[in-house]
């Protein structure tokens, strides 16, 4: 290596140090607030309203100590009016949305069956889930239930704030291996991971540095465009390429053999699919047909006209309309509302014309209004600009005995600027 190359490397090093120092100074001087929650609002309203419809969600307890167990439970319905622009849930995985691994997920069940790989879900049916979480990082965290659907991406459900107290240093995650040895997954092979990061980063830096120290990328590109690659076929390049290729293969093979000798019994990543039967269809005497819907833009209100038929033996009354995790309730719905459900997702602006119950055997046209600023806060009014301007949600009714009936409703929605 000649003096010119050494000087070039020195200048590049100074540039790198200057950029690093400037970046550090910016992070120390500029006050950047961390993003804490509500990324789900960036998802399209038609995806949140008409794909997976969540209900009966619970987050317990409100405060969990490090190493203690918390749970997320609830149910979800796969809407019959599944959007055409969204991939069907033929391959779906139940997940948890959180700001980094603040909890460790211990187990997930769908309809009581352990679920740790993806599988098909049935449109038009319901599933009940339970997730057990072990508290890891202290703080106040926004926790979502979530379903990842192939060709559709993550579909986030409503979220609640879960608090973790204690010290992160006290966290442990012990498991027993097939050989009977107990290890702590929080710290197991940490030094080994650091070692391999250094090895591969070092090899990559050496590979790039070998070409940076010689004629730079831009001159090589100009020569290639002007004269072809004959002038660039340097014997040193071939020797260097073969040396790095052999070294890479040796590292991969050696690392594999070492791992086999240290850990002879391993379980491969599972590539099958989990087939979970949906919940049985509960008897529902209420039939609903949406005939008209509009969204009052200045009034922030969704108005729906429906034909409701009561085929049961008892009077039924509308109490709740839930969509995209937002629950619009009236007095009846409030009486059945879980007091621990996030207050920021509850709106009391549900009204029904007449407030008269639907009698057994009666078919009646009902006009419902769900009005609240949450349409704007949750960015659901953007459905007017969606490729499918349709709404969707779950309408809940109760009979005199307190039995709840759930109907998934959907329909085209028209924007208006005056009450029609």
Where does each model-flagged region fall?
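Juxtamembrane interface at the cytosolic side of transmembrane helices
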Residues: 204-242
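Short beta-strand and strand-turn-strand segments in soluble, beta-rich domains
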Residues: 52-55, 100-116, 336-352
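Short, aromatic-rich amphipathic segments at membrane interfaces
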Residues: 162-198
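Beta-sandwich strand segments
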Residues: 152-162, 401-409
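N-terminal edge beta-strand
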Residues: 41-70, 282-290
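C-terminal soluble domains/tails of integral membrane proteins
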Residues: 262-420
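Internal/C-terminal transmembrane anchor helices
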Residues: 233-261
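Membrane-proximal low-complexity regions enriched in glycine and acidic/polar residues
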Residues: 64-157
């Amino acid at each position: 290596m000649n003096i010119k190359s050494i000087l070039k490397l020195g200048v590049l090093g100074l540039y790198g140090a200057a950029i690093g120092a400037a970046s550090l100074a910016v992070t120390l001087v500029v006050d950047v607030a961390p993003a804490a929650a509500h990324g789900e609002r960036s998802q399209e309203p038609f995806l949140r309203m008409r794909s997976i419809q969540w209900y009966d969600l619970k987050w317990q307890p409100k405060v969990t100590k490090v190493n203690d167990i918390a749970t997320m439970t609830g149910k979800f319905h796969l809407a019959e009016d599944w959007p055409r622009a969204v991939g069907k849930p033929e391959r779906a995985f139940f997940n948890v949305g959180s700001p980094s691994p603040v909890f460790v997920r211990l187990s997930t069940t769908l309809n009581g069956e352990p679920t740790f790989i993806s599988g098909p879900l049935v449109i038009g049916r319901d599933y009940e889930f339970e997730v057990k979480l072990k508290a890891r990082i202290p703080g106040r965290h926004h926790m979502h239930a979530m379903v990842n659907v192939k060709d559709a991406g993550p579909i986030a459900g409503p979220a609640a704030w879960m608090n973790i107290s204690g010290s992160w240093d006290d966290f442990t995650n012990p498991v027993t291996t097939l050989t009977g040895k107990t290890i702590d997954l929080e710290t197991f092979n940490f030094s080994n991971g650091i070692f391999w990061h250094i090895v591969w980063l070092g090899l990559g830096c050496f590979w790039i540095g070998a070409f940076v120290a010689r004629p730079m990328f831009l001159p090589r590109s100009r020569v290639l465009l002007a004269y072809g690659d004959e002038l660039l076929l340097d014997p040193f390049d071939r020797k260097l390429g073969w040396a790095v290729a052999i070294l890479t293969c040796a590292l991969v093979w050696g690392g594999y053999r070492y791992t086999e000798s240290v850990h002879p019994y391993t379980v491969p990543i599972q590539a099958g699919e989990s087939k979970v039967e949906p919940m049985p269809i509960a008897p529902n005497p209420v039939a609903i047909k949406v005939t008209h819907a509009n969204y009052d833009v200045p009034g922030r209100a969704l108005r729906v006209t429906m034909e409701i038929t009561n085929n049961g033996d008892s009077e039924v009354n509308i109490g709740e309309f839930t969509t995209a995790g937002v629950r619009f309730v009236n007095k009846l719905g409030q009486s059945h509302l879980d007091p621990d459900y996030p207050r920021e997702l509850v709106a009391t602006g549900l009204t029904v014309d007449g407030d008269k119950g639907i009698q057994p055997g009666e078919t009646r046209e009902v006009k419902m209004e769900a009005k609240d600023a949450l349409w704007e806060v949750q960015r659901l009014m953007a459905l007017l600009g969606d490729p499918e301007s349709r709404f969707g949600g779950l309408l809940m009714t109760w009979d005199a005995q307190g039995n709840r009936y759930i109907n998934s409703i959907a329909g085209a929605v028209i924007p208006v600027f005056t009450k029609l």
